[in-house]
């Protein structure tokens, strides 16, 4: 697979104006790590990818890839498969043991609270921890991960990929406090008193509805009414018997 990915990376033209870079919400430096992958320098490629993206194994599986829609090559040919290059770069790095904890060399003595443990909260927490702040992540659910934990089905992204990132963050010094609802279990006054800064990274809990004909019918549900239940993998027992 890696030779195929390198061939795809070689198709990148390193455009004078890289519209893929503009199309990426994270501002990933796509032409640079495409070039490194093509040159078979995977170690440098993952460093360049991690420079703008804390969790490429998440985005490489879940992102709709607006970078590919913006690819200049797509004007008269197939776009570079940027998403697959990203995904193989990070998966290869995990396989080779290159993704390791990066604890700060020095501490600032500052304390930061991050409210919400979705992708935004986790990325903020990791960056803040790595520059030396003492970071605590508050999550009202019983497990850390937010939408990554409760909204993404297993067939889209296995939960072990989230768990190993959380283990990396804990090794770096980030503290997680699940099952803690800010506003009830912990007051805003407590946060502002105990911490030097607070990052609000809570997700949207109210879905946008559609005024479509038949919306009021029984059996039509919002996705987030079902996905958290399914993601918890609720089953009746561990074994079943099939009788015909």
Task: Locate each region found by the language model.
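A broad detector of the eukaryotic-type serine/threonine protein kinase catalytic domain
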Residues: 29, 50, 54, 68, ...
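Conserved small/polar residues in nucleotide/adenosyl-binding loops
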Residues: 1-3, 233-240, 244
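Ferredoxin-type iron-sulfur electron-transfer modules and their immediate structural context
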Residues: 1-111, 159, 198-228
């Amino acid at each position: 697979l890696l030779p195929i990915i390198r061939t795809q990376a070689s198709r990148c033209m390193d455009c004078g104006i890289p519209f893929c870079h503009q199309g990426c919400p994270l501002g990933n430096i796509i032409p640079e790590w495409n070039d490194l992958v093509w040159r078979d320098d995977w170690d440098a490629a993952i460093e360049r990818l991690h420079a703008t993206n804390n969790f490429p194994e998440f985005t490489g599986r879940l992102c709709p890839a607006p970078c590919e829609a913006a690819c200049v090559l797509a004007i008269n040919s197939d776009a570079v498969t940027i998403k697959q290059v990203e995904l193989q770069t990070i998966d290869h790095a995990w396989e080779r043991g290159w993704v390791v904890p990066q604890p700060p060399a020095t501490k600032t003595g500052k304390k930061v609270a991050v409210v919400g443990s979705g992708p935004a909260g986790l990325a903020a927490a990791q960056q803040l921890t790595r520059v030396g702040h003492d970071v605590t992540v508050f999550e009202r659910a019983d497990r850390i991960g937010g939408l990554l934990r409760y909204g993404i089905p297993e067939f889209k992204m296995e939960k072990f990929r989230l768990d190993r990132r959380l283990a990396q963050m804990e090794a770096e010094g980030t503290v997680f406090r699940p099952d803690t609802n800010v506003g009830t279990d912990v007051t805003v006054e407590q946060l502002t008193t105990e911490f030097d800064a607070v990052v609000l990274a809570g997700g949207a809990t109210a879905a946008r509805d559609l005024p479509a004909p038949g919306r009021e019918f029984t059996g039509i549900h919002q996705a987030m009414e079902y996905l958290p239940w399914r993601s918890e993998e609720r089953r009746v027992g561990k074994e079943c018997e099939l009788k015909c």
